[in-house]
């Protein structure tokens, strides 16, 4: 399989992107990489060109570019060319650690939306206390959503959890302010009713935010505005907790001695809370796998994302979503233009 990679997107591009690519092709003999970006800069780090092809371009989308305008004006940007390769059948999937909004726009405008899917959804896998993790969507592709959209999000998340995360009959929950069916606003109440009355996936009811990391569900569905705030809250809380723990352990001689014995365990805890270890955030609802690697990804983060995309292609996640979208009868009412 061929995977198109934006070599110029992310905080540590192109170095960490290239190092991650080399690690992936060394591990997976069935993977070929199309690297889009500045050939001179890429070659500074690309020491092994086995199954790696560079497609040179001087143009790239910056982190502060306005997404839609950048995609339309920068036709030769590395991110856009990577998506175009997928559109033209030259690659099976694409990856970028660059501008999230631009990648979503590229996925929609260049690769295109799946017929019958009303809205795309951005879905990372977030950590849980056991290290199993859960898929959450939408985390920012849509600020607003309708009940029909959340119904479809449940289907897409369930397919991914089953195919890639290898969970038999994934538990799908709806994020709400209480577990009772009557709780919530108009969106969550109507979404609950739709999800309860479908048989395309295993809906287990509402989940409260405090239980997200407790392995209660395998897939959690919400609108993009709420989801993005939850993501930032988890990131901020995790960082604050580790910072406070570090300050406590370094306060006084006895604590420092204890910290030296706990160092390995604390590093393991930090790794468990790092959701980039699960790969990137999938843009579900488009015609091919499009995955957003974390902007600060190192080589291992890029490797993990390539491994994730390889699994998506191999397990035919997009093809399964296309085949099963009709099971969610209420959706598919909006234009695919």
UniProtKB/Swiss-Prot annotation:
EC number: 2.3.1.274
Pathway assignment: Lipid metabolism; phospholipid metabolism
Gene3D superfamilies: Isopropylmalate Dehydrogenase
The UniProt record lists the keyword Transcription: no
Protein family according to the UniProt entry: Belongs to the PlsX family.
PANTHER family: FATTY ACID/PHOSPHOLIPID SYNTHESIS PROTEIN PLSX, PHOSPHATE ACYLTRANSFERASE
Function recorded in the entry: Catalyzes the reversible formation of acyl-phosphate (acyl-PO(4)) from acyl-[acyl-carrier-protein] (acyl-ACP). This enzyme utilizes acyl-ACP as fatty acyl donor, but not acyl-CoA.
Complex formation: Homodimer. Probably interacts with PlsY.
Name of the protein in its database record: Phosphate acyltransferase
UniProt organism field: Listeria monocytogenes serovar 1/2a (strain ATCC BAA-679 / EGD-e)
Gene: plsX
């Amino acid at each position: 399989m061929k995977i198109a990679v934006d070599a110029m997107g992310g905080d540590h591009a192109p170095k960490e992107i290239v190092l991650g690519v080399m690690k992936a092709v060394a591990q997976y003999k069935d993977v070929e990489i199309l690297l889009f970006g500045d050939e001179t800069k890429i070659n500074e780090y690309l020491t092994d060109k086995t199954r790696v092809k560079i497609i040179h371009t001087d143009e790239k989308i910056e982190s502060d570019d306005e997404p839609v305008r950048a995609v339309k004006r920068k036709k030769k940007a590395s991110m856009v060319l990577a998506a175009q390769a997928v559109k033209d059948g030259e690659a099976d999937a694409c990856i970028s650690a660059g501008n999230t909004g631009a990648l979503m726009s590229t996925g929609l405008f260049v690769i295109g939306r799946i017929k019958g899917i009303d809205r795309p959804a951005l879905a990372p896998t977030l950590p849980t206390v056991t290290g199993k993790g859960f898929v959450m969507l939408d985390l920012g592709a849509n600020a607003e959503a309708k009940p029909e959209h959340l119904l479809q999000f449940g289907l897409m998340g369930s397919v991914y959890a089953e195919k890639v995360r290898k969970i038999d009959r994934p538990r799908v929950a709806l994020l709400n302010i209480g577990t009772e069916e009557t709780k919530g606003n108009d969106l969550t109440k109507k979404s609950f009713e739709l999800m309860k009355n479908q048989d395309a996936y295993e809906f287990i009811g509402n989940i409260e935010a405090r239980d997200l990391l407790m392995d209660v569900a395998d897939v959690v569905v919400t609108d993009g505005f709420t989801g993005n705030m939850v993501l930032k809250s988890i990131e901020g809380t995790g960082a604050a907790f580790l910072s406070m723990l570090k300050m406590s352990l370094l306060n006084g001689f006895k604590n420092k001695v204890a910290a030296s014995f706990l160092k390995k365990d604390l590093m393991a805890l930090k790794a468990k809370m790092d959701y980039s270890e699960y790969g990137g955030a999938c843009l579900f609802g488009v015609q091919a796998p499009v995955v957003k690697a974390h902007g600060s990804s190192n080589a291992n983060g890029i490797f993990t994302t390539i491994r994730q995309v390889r699994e998506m292609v191999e397990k035919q996640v997009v093809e399964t979503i296309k085949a099963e979208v009709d099971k969610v009868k209420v959706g598919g009412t909006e234009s695919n233009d």
